[in-house]
Design a protein with these regions (language model features):
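A positional/architectural concept
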Residues: 1-47
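Charge/polar-rich, low-complexity and marginally structured segments
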Residues: 42-154
Length: 154
């Protein structure tokens, strides 16, 4: 999982010479953007690249989105920055919190364009990771997510 980019598959590990040093790189294919990237193996963790979560963690993220939550600041710029910080951390629980809070905020008032894009990105990241983790179609996971989101509001 690559924060803010989504689920990727390590295709190979290649050795390249960089500034006269041999460096190992992950060659990662990101399906969502149909893009291949190279990331130095020794910097991958620092960049937030992590394995897909296990089934238990994916189910916890689904549970989180149906739990009660603290209302978020009404100032959208502050909300946006807080959520961007969570997105950069890249944990599935942080992404689930973004989806939950912005979904419920959108029910109160239409989200500003930047926040709407952030919500859409976080939702896609959450769907993709849970889909891979639970081995379910993206459509099934999308239905699960929205069912959970609606459960809390009723």
């Amino acid at each position: 999982m690559y924060p803010s980019q989504g689920v990727g598959v390590i295709k190979t590990i290649e050795e390249k010479v960089f500034k006269s040093n041999k460096v190992l790189y992950y060659v990662i294919y990101l399906e969502v953007s149909d893009m291949t990237i190279m990331v130095p193996v020794d910097k991958a963790t620092g960049l937030g690249i992590r394995p897909i979560v296990g089934k238990d963690e994916a189910l916890k993220a689904l549970e989180l989105i149906s739990e009660e939550y603290e209302p978020i600041p009404s100032d959208w710029k502050l909300r946006y920055q807080m959520n961007m910080d969570l997105l950069k951390k890249g944990s599935i629980m942080d992404i689930a919190m973004i989806v939950r809070s912005l979904y419920h905020r959108s029910k109160v008032k239409e989200l500003p364009i930047l926040e709407r894009k952030l919500y859409d990105s976080a939702l896609k990241l959450l769907e993709d990771e849970i889909s891979c983790s639970l081995r379910k179609s993206k459509e099934e996971v999308e239905n699960l997510i929205f069912t959970r989101l609606e459960t809390e509001t009723e």
